[in-house]
């Protein structure tokens, strides 16, 4: 079997159907608050859903970073041997 034929087969087997894409977009519509709050969320285009999903994920990452920074600052301000410090360390280290 030629290399290009194997590539085409691997590529086609990893593709998802239009129905699967539609289902995934629908699940994203239900998951993203900015879209879910829109009364006409079913009319929002797939590209808009993907754009809002990316924005939402970026915002979540920023919030997680901010919370981690705040926990680090809090940890620096308390007794490192206290039970609270142990809890904060467990939150920071996941």
Curated annotation (Swiss-Prot):
<dbReference type="GO" id="GO:0005634">
    <property type="term" value="C:nucleus"/>
</dbReference>
<keyword id="KW-0341">Growth regulation</keyword>
<keyword id="KW-0939">Gibberellin signaling pathway</keyword>
<keyword id="KW-0805">Transcription regulation</keyword>
<dbReference type="GO" id="GO:0009740">
    <property type="term" value="P:gibberellic acid mediated signaling pathway"/>
</dbReference>
<dbReference type="InterPro" id="IPR036638">
    <property type="entry name" value="HLH_DNA-bd_sf"/>
</dbReference>
<keyword id="KW-0539">Nucleus</keyword>
<dbReference type="GO" id="GO:0040008">
    <property type="term" value="P:regulation of growth"/>
</dbReference>
<dbReference type="GO" id="GO:0000325">
    <property type="term" value="C:plant-type vacuole"/>
</dbReference>
<comment type="similarity">
    <text>Belongs to the bHLH protein family.</text>
</comment>
<dbReference type="InterPro" id="IPR011598">
    <property type="entry name" value="bHLH_dom"/>
</dbReference>
<dbReference type="GO" id="GO:0048510">
    <property type="term" value="P:regulation of timing of transition from vegetative to reproductive phase"/>
</dbReference>
<dbReference type="Pfam" id="PF23174">
    <property type="entry name" value="bHLH_ILI"/>
</dbReference>
<dbReference type="InterPro" id="IPR044293">
    <property type="entry name" value="PRE"/>
</dbReference>
<feature type="domain" description="bHLH">
    <location>
        <begin position="5"/>
        <end position="60"/>
    </location>
</feature>
<dbReference type="GO" id="GO:0046983">
    <property type="term" value="F:protein dimerization activity"/>
</dbReference>
<comment type="function">
    <text>Atypical and probable non DNA-binding bHLH transcription factor that integrates multiple signaling pathways to regulate cell elongation and plant development. Regulates light responses by binding and inhibiting the activity of the bHLH transcription factor HFR1, a critical regulator of light signaling and shade avoidance. May have a regulatory role in various aspects of gibberellin-dependent growth and development.</text>
</comment>
<keyword id="KW-0804">Transcription</keyword>
<dbReference type="GO" id="GO:0009640">
    <property type="term" value="P:photomorphogenesis"/>
</dbReference>
<protein>
    <recommendedName>
        <fullName>Transcription factor PRE2</fullName>
    </recommendedName>
</protein>
<comment type="subunit">
    <text>Interacts with HFR1.</text>
</comment>
<dbReference type="GO" id="GO:0003700">
    <property type="term" value="F:DNA-binding transcription factor activity"/>
</dbReference>
